[in-house]
Every structure is written in structure tokens, then in C-alpha cells.
Amino acid sequence: MDSDDPRRVETIEDNETGFLELRHVNVARGERVVLHDVNLTIRAGEHVAILGPNGCGKSTLILAMTCQIYPMVEPGMAVRIFGRERWDLTQLRRHFGVVAAGLLSELPGERTAVTTGLDAVIAGFFSASTLWPNLHVTGEMRDRAREALERMEALHLAKQLVGEMSAGEKRRILIARALVHRPRQLLLDEPSNALYLAAQRELRETLRRLAQEGTGLVLVTHHLGDILPEIERVILMRDGRIAGDGPRAELLTEARLSELFNAPVRIGRDEEWLHSW
């Protein structure tokens, strides 16, 4: 397979079992430090929720985790993904899928309304904004795009125009774009943001199935309802710092969350799901 082939995936050695390792990570925006001495390790295949209020540093942490910004160079600082400090970002995306709510406006066909769901997912192989005529699309790519749509229970969207889809349908297309590479780990930023209640529940059930099939999930959110039953580890963030890291039963308490959000939080349970008010 040619080195420029978008299906080509750089091999990860079997002993590189850790997905993410952050050591003494500090990030500054201008003169203000927005991440303070973050130390974090996530195993490959582990399901984790990163929970915190708006403005706590979650978005900056995502940028650091995905090599889109770089921490301050200091003694002991390290950012390793699957055991490596240096990655070609195109290759990294084939092991580590990222789905951010802000990407909805950049979804292929969002502005032109001429791209189908299937073409939008195929374009994910090329990290392209649309399926340009000069891109060489193979039968295998089309098969894997359909497979990704099927995993997202969105095969019915294959022929539908992206510009005519609801927010929930577009979210499924975005996730399918990440899944075409069959990544080992998937990061979702505010996965239920801007979705109505039924669409939230449907998406969360689909994400549960991905977790059960073996895709490691990292959910970054400020909604307690986004924390799937499969997620056993929770990381709390506040003021650019890790405020807690441990089993969900220990951290998802009314006392801890009230302190985290600086407001009274009440927790209820609906079958396996948690919700707050």
C-alpha cells in the first residue's frame, strides 16, 4: 500500500498499551496559564469521562491531548500518545478519533448542501472538507464508510443530503467520519450538546454499543447525563487543574459535584443513567 494512501495506518507496537500520558503539562494563553501541572494517564481501550463546568480548561486539555497546541517546555513535561511523543497528525487520526461539537459547522456539505451522508463519511479518509473530484476513492473506502454508518445506526442517511439533516443526524455523521479509520480510541467533546432529549438518549445508547464493541471512549462534558454506564473512571476539572480522578462511585456524589460546579447539585437515577438538577 502506498505511503500516501489514506487507508495506510502506521503500526503501533503491542507493548504500547497506554493511550495517553500527560506529565507536568502547563499551557498558557497569552500571559495567562490555563492548564496547571496536569498529570494524567489513560489506558488504551479505557472508558473515561472528563467532567467540569464551562471555562474549567476542558477545551484546552482537548487541544493538548490532540497535539493541536503545545505545553510550556519545562523539566519533566511530556505528552505521549500510544507511547510516542512525536506523531504525524494524519497518522494519529487513524488511531485516535476526535469528534468535537464545534466541527458541525465544518461538516462537508453544511454550506453547499450537495454532499450526501456517505460522501461526507468517505471524505473522512482524506480529512477533507468535501469529496473533491480529484480524490481517489476505492471500493474498500466505500465499504468501510458504510460499515461506520451502520455502527452509528445511520445507514439510512447514506443518500440524504447533509444540509437537510438534523443536528443529531449530523452528529452521527461526524462520529462515523472518525470511525472509518477504525480507531482504538475515540474522544467526544460535549457529545449531546444542542440535541433534543430523544436525540440525546438515542446517541448515548449508540455510544454504549461502541464501548461494548471495544472502542475506548473519552467523553468530555459538563452534562452528568453524558456519562455512560460503561464509564467507571471519572476525571474532574476545575480552574485548569485536575480536581479529582477515580471511580465514578467515589466522585459522582452530590457533595463533590456541588463543590465542582460551585452550586447545589442533586443527583437522580433513571435505570442505569444518572441525571442532575
Functional labels for PLM-detected ranges:
Residues 182:
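Conserved catalytic motifs of ABC-family nucleotide-binding domains
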Residues 258-277:
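ABC ATPase nucleotide-binding domains
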